[in-house]
Amino acid sequence: MPVDPSLVGREFPAPAPLTVTQERVGAFAAAVGHPGGDVPPTFPIVLAFDAMQAFLDAEAIDLHRIVHGEQRFAYARPLAVGDELSATLTVTGLRQIGGADIIATASEITDATGAVVCTGKATLVHGGAA
């Protein structure tokens, strides 16, 4: 079943803020093979994924039917240990190609003051029901 086109423009916040800790950074760095030290530039995916999961859950879309097509980040400033971050995903586009839904999203990552730290754009390919 295709994804509802009225989703375009809807926002899905991550369920809770995330505090960037040295332990989280270390675990993420080890998982992705980053040498450690500063917060890896791909770390925002942790929070962006929480917002994406909120979208998938709200719309009853099975993560196992999603292929991650593209991901980009643009930074207003580097992330740092101690940052408390929140994320909101917005569905920015939707089209169907060959029976698949191509879902464009934008995630805004903000700090505790509400300042934008990072924005992410992703393309998700939804294969529909099995």
Predicted features along the sequence, with ranges:
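Mid-chain, well-packed structural core segment of small domains
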Residues: 62-88
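HotDog/MaoC-like acyl-thioester-processing domains
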Residues: 1-3, 78-130
